[in-house]
Structures are given as structure tokens and as C-alpha cells.
Amino acid sequence: MDKSDLVQKAKLAEQAERYDDMAAAMKAVTEGGVELSNEERNLLSVAYKNVVGARRSSWRVISSIEQKTEGNEKKQQMAREYREKIETELQDICSDVLGLLEKYLIANASQAESKVFYLKMKGDYYRYLSEVASGDSKATTVENSQKAYQDAFDISKKDMQPTHPIRLGLALNFSVFYYEILNSPENACQLAKTAFDEAIAELDTLNEDSYKDSTLIMQLLRDNLTLWTSENQGEEAGENEN
């Protein structure tokens, strides 16, 4: 199947909400070795975000059930085995994405915008791995995630407007990484607040095409800040991500 057919297949799969098919089509496009267009890049990102998102959600549900079945060994064992099955799926998906990023996407990125997009993605998928990892492998995934986010962040500050939706989305996810993975609310709040304030200060640079995307992410940054700084924040509260 040629590239345009694969892209069309991915769009059909998206409309049918068959994200595994969508991801497979966009993986094949990426393996063609040609730099992706913005549209193709977004299709790839949406596909895998949904594929991995379903497993992240399932993993959280089953982990919670596993904790609640303490005292009932048989039920707990079933929950644990099911969690491990979901974990394996999640790890395989993340390995797929990280492989594509390393082999094709980051190397082929000719524009700063693309490089930041893919390095952010690398940070995201190592973060997803770190959520289910333990011991040495957790330390490694956390380190890899932080390095990818930091590399992306440095490029975005140098080469992109503070109102650019990719720069804002990176700040959003990097701040979530600080809060959830590094347990560092101060750094999370500082990063989110700086990104929000810098964007507000340059609202006149907002590109008409990306106005909706940028303002939505700014709203998510503000929501997270409100959540993180409120004293009576419950453990169950969930952060917004891009």
C-alpha cells in the first residue's frame, strides 16, 4: 500500500475509532523513512495517544482493584495477573513509539517545531513507561523522560513563540512529569506558571490557525495550577495532559 493510501486508511480508522488500525497505518507510513507532514505527524500522535491511553486507563482501574482485594488472595492474584498483562501491552506500545522516534522521526526532523514535537513525544512515552515501572527500570525511564523533555524545552524556548501550541503542550506535560513522576509540586507550578504568564504577555503573537489550540492548553495549564496550589487537593484529582 502506498503512502497516500495508508494515510487515507488512518483517517478512516480514526473516524471509526479503531485506533490500533490507525496506529498500524501510521507506523507503516513512518517506516517509509520520509519526513512526515504536519498532518501525518498529528495522525501518528493521535493514533498512539489513544492506543496507549486505553491501556493507561485500564492499568489504573485494575491497580486500584488489586489494592482493594488485599486479604482475598485468589482475587488479588487474578487482578495482579491481569494488571501484568495490561502492563506488557502498554510497554510494547511505548517501545514501538520510542523505536519510531529514535530510528526515523527525530533524526529526520528538519524544523525546530518537528524536533520539539518528537522530543516531547519521547518524553511522554518514557513517562508512560515510568508509571508502570519499578526499581532500576523506573529510574532509567524517569531519567530518559526528563532528558527528552528538557531537550525539547531548550529548543522550544530558543526557536518558538511562547504562544505556540507545541511549546505550550510541552510545558503542560513537562509540568505534569514534575508533579506526578518526580513528586516536585514547586517545580511543576513554576514551569506551568511561567509558560502561562509568558504566553499571556505575548497574546498578540497568537497565530489565527492555532488560536483555539493555544488558548485551550493555556486553560489546562491554569486548571492544573489551580489544582496543585489548592490546599485541600484530594489524592484522586487528575491532572490535565496534552
Curated annotation (Swiss-Prot):
Recorded superkingdom: Eukaryota
GO term, biological process aspect, one: protein localization
Positions where N-acetylmethionine occurs in the chain: M1
Site (Interaction with phosphoserine on interacting protein) location in chain: R56, R127
A GO cellular component entry from the record: cytoplasm
Chief localisation class: cytoplasm
PROSITE patterns linked to this entry: 1433_1 (PS00796), 1433_2 (PS00797)
Keywords, sorted A to Z: Acetylation, Cytoplasm
Family according to the record: Belongs to the 14-3-3 family.
UniProt protein name: 14-3-3 protein beta/alpha-B
Organism: Danio rerio (Zebrafish)
